[in-house]
Amino acid sequence: MSGAPSLADKTVMIVDDDQTMRMLIRRMLTRMKIGTLTEAEGGQHALQQLELAPAECNLVICDWNMPGMSGVELFGHIRALKPGLPFLMLTGRSDAGSVVAARNAGVPAYIVKPISPEELKTKVSYLLAKTA
């Protein structure tokens, strides 16, 4: 048996206004055998879900650019609601200024689209291992 922690008891929330992107990420996470996957169409919807059941989420994977509330804004709200919740930002922004802005906002992990399954698996496994 490997030393890797089981992901079967973990819950991951996917936040993206693009349904196709949510489905793609869901497919990748399903292959990783994550126990429960939830989805939110935007920041407000994600916050509502987290307020109803904050203990039931182990990781939020979120797009940066969404209408109404950006991923960086959502991250700030989540930090106030559940400070230790791991957060992974997904974005098409690859310029140095955007990376610095995300880091300055405290975003702990960042993937530039297009997302590779290997990179997603590495970051998700790392972030979830910190919650074990």
Regions found by a protein language model. Give the residues of each.
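Receiver (REC) domain active-site loop signature in two-component systems and cognate sites
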Residues: 66
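Helix N-cap/capping motif at the beta->alpha junctions
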Residues: 39-48, 71
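Alpha4 helix (beta4-alpha4-beta5 surface) of REC/receiver domains from two-component response regulators
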Residues: 73, 94-109
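Two-component/phosphorelay signaling modules centered on CheY-like receiver
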Residues: 19-38
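Short amphipathic alpha-helix used as the core "switch/output" element in two-component signaling
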Residues: 48, 72-83
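Active-site beta3 strand of CheY-like receiver
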Residues: 54-61
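C-terminal output helix
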Residues: 97, 115-124
